[in-house]
Amino acid sequence: MLHARIAARAFNTPLLVEPSKAMAFLSGLGPRILGRRVELADLPVVAGDLGAGALPARASLLADPLSDRLRQQGDAPYAMVDGIAVIEISGVLIHRGSWIGQSSGQTSYEGIAAQIEAAAKDPAVRGLALEIDSFGGEVAGVFDLADRIRAIRASKPIWAFVAEHAFSAGYALASQADRILLPRTGAVGSIGVVVMHADLSGQLDQDGVRVSLIHSGQHKVDGNPYAPLPEAVRADIQREIDVLRFLFADTVAAGRGGRLSQEAALATEAAVYRGMDAVAAGLADEVTNLTRGFASFRQALGAPSTSKLSRAFSASHLKPKKEAVMASKKQPHDTPHDTDLEFVEIT
């Protein structure tokens, strides 16, 4: 199997992503990761020609946290508009990434946490605006970050602005804001969990390759890609993701308060809701042009109108310079290549 680190984060592990992204992942990167054609729903998927790119180095969650480095450098890791810290959450959401903003189609939970914590401690920040456009990402790290966002809103108002998509892990974070605003075409939801399993046994048989797994422990090689998925293992995975779905719904309910209960979140059955349907279902609070919605946030804070509203949602102003906050030590030998991880969120 090629690109083992990517495969390990994409297959046989629960992810909070919108299902269509799983199809995009398998279509675009599946053949390159697995080293052979991928068949999905009886349809062959052929390898595409994707560019190669290196990812930033990882950072420890316990030592030298990213937020400490930001304070030492004295840089504000967010755009500021009339006392509002604008924090972009876009692309694939991943665990353990030591950078701010989007990099190679990814945004890290660690980076988002550093931004919101810095904003919470900054006396110049009167409120936080989460600008979200994401189909989701990894389960690991998302619920802890959701809890941190919910805790911070007790001291500073937080509004979520859905810049078209807040699905799965993206919605887990959006739901922790005081208010969720989206445009007419914006969509939210996908409160569910998905796991992908790759069965390479048929292709290996055709290639004359037989893999023997010598292991100690009955469940040590459960879900391995060299054999069809046994029903007992499938049932174990199903139980695991069902538990995670309940945790997901409970987290959403904690963030939404009386607007969406855990039972109602589960009753969505991971559906997505667009525009007014999202408001009617309790997954969002208002359908509006995001520039007008941002003006409403400023008005609610009593901030003076000292800058153009269009700046709030202009990519040239919103994206922090990640070069200033990259990890100081890179590890090229530990860096995956040949991937646009815009797709890895999808499993």
Residues of each region from the PLM?
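N-terminal organellar transit peptides
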Residues: 1-347
